[in-house]
Amino acid sequence: MKLKFKVQPYQTNAVNDVVDCFVGQPMTTGLTYRIDPGRKAQTSAFEEGFKNADLALTDVQILENIQKVQRRQNLPVSQSLTDFTTFDSKGARVPVKAAYKRDALAATRVHLDVEMETGTGKTYCYIKTIFEMNKRYGWSKFIIMVPSIAIREGVYKSLQITADHFTENYGKKARFFIYNSKRLHELESFSSDAGINVMVINIQAFNARGADNRRIYEELDDFQSRKPIDVIASNRPILILDEPQKMEGAATMEALPKFKPLFIILL
């Protein structure tokens, strides 16, 4: 049985609002870099990787784009890229804690907070955003970060069931996988593949104390004495935080800069 997806106008509008925050960014594809070969004795074609192009826009240009989107949607207008807010227990917007802002800005200067209610197709929207970002700007490396294993499995299932739908609409197929510290060949492919690549990771994979969870920060013999986090960071991935209100713990926030995200989208 093949599922049919009806695209809702509000979903398309939400995707365009996010993508329009980078109007003026040049289309760049195939930006290569040398993947750290570790202790490999010989070079190989797989040592060439493809990373996201850096932001070419100035802070002023990005802020102006964001403000245009906010005015279009009748939203409060941000006065700076550091104008971070969150919700209190009554649903009112309040400034974020100083420690949160410090760690967030250490990760990247650009944070896009997209408000969508549960049941409105949020996961569909950010998967579509991935394809639109690739279509308009050439960015191809994405990480979807989630607060739990259950949500991780749900996101992965959504990627599976929408795969044909997005291939039909964009003429491209995304490669996606769940990060597993014992299947690091998938991370190697994430770096070396030129197409759209999506890694799904739950925060326990990098902020917990267990031996398996700490492997992401360790030089591993079975990974040519490299640290997985360094290989991830070299891609300058776009980081999508699904349910970020459940990921505001100190261990998670302090880890975000290590991923070296190009920018962060919060949904």
Give a label for each model feature:
Residues M1-L267:
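RecA-like P-loop NTPase motor core of helicase/translocase proteins
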